[in-house]
Amino acid sequence: MFPEEPAENGAGFRTPLAGLDNVILTPHIGGSTEEAQEAIALDVGEKLARFWRHGTTATAVNFPQVDLPQVKEGLLRILHVHRNVPGVLGKMHTLLAKAGINIHAEFLQSDRDTSFVILDVDRFGDRALLDGLERMDETVRMRVAG
């Protein structure tokens, strides 16, 4: 959090943190006091950590909302964002079945254009399966949680 904001909309914002791989910069998020900024920063950080670890997007504004339990011990979680069109889940299920991978839990939430599916599976098989999910024409982004 920076105590001073750019002078106007569209004004350049420069910081040495901008190019670092382990830093996420957020826009102004509404704190008018240092205490409020600290509380908001902690809240945003916790939400980002929950998304990174578990795939939870419970309070998202412009993304399908999913509030997930922690992945059960021994299972692995795949997070897959794709265009909301017919047949995507069928393609994903076919790839997993051909690899002999069992789906233990599946969570799907969609909005008009975007779907977010979370799969808890018993294993990943080889890298070819993940590459296959990533290369699907409808895939926007795919990753393994954790």
Segments the model singles out, each with a brief description of its role:
Residues 58-146:
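A conserved regulatory-domain signal marking ACT and ACT-like small-molecule sensing domains
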Residues 1-70, 116, 146:
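Rossmann-like dinucleotide-binding domain for NAD(H)/NADP(H)
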